[in-house]
């Protein structure tokens, strides 16, 4: 898909905004906080990460690289690149016969920010942008954010605003999907099906209560309009196969909170988390989670977690054989129904300080992490496995 004039304008606006934050902010906000003014050197962090997801009909392998840099005068720049290799046999992904296919999604993002010293407070301003592309869609987004630190950073207030724009297409796989018409156009590529636009806003507050106790709370709002269905899904309506049809506007709200406590005698931390969600499609959800962190010596930390999720159904959801011609909206999306999920997992973090004095001493300030989660889904997606591993190296 070609990049629309609107998308080009959005990305240009992001570049201009980022340049303003990074280069001219000091003129009106005061002195920036520098990473290493004394030595005049840049500092940064490099992350190499592998992501894996598996369920009955879909497998995703996604290598990722992230780079963050901080200049001597306090400008922070980050970039992220991810490649998704998605193997699926799901009709919802465009399969029209019993085959598996693999397609690739490329995603890149950049962000820039700067923190300014306001005396007894610090203010960080930032901007970010993202572009994601695969054969049947192009997604772009941009955002701005601000973080205010008070009371010697024991109180942190954060706010963000973002814009998203997606061009949605359809590419069919299987049978004679590779056929072309007399003009040479691939018949499997149905072209642009629709577009989606949206804005999102979030605000959060984090407060240190005691040296070993802190709490946080957040509110998120997402407004989207446009094509909100899946171009590959169809519903049998009184014997007629009908394309999925969802409302064209959706407003989502989420409230979340976290309480964290560190037990110094046993080097153990407990995090209690809760998230509630509701939208104007009448879906409501609650999502409690508990995490336990345990230090195992000087170099190893183990995290275990359990997460519960349950939601109600949307106002237009029906069993697949219960839709009628009078229904304005029809869906085959399992996420529109009511269901319950359980997730159980662990994460292991190994600090690499033991590499000091060896040929790999350049890694001694970094760490390696490995995580594994098992998800029991109460809908037709069934059970799923999520795994990650990464190497994080500061420099």
For the regions a language model picked out, list residue spans one by one.
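Short glycine/proline- and aromatic-enriched beta-strand/turn motifs that initiate or cap beta-hairpins
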Residues: 25-71, 75, 385-387
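Outer-membrane beta-barrel translocator/channel fold
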Residues: 58, 80-115, 154-214, 221, ...
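Outer-membrane beta-barrel translocator domains and adjoining extracellular loop/strand segments
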Residues: 58-63, 80, 90-96, 137-145, ...
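Transmembrane beta-barrel strands of outer-membrane/channel proteins
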Residues: 46-52, 79-83, 125-131, 142-144, ...
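Hydrophobic, lipid-facing positions within transmembrane beta-strands of outer-membrane proteins
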Residues: 44, 61-65, 106-110, 140-144, ...
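Outer membrane beta-barrel transmembrane domains
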Residues: 96-98, 222-224, 228-260, 277-289, ...
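Residue-level signature of outer-membrane beta-barrel architecture
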Residues: 69-71, 114-116, 148-150, 207, ...
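Short loop/turn motifs that connect adjacent beta-strands in outer-membrane beta-barrel proteins
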Residues: 25-43, 74, 117-123, 151-155, ...
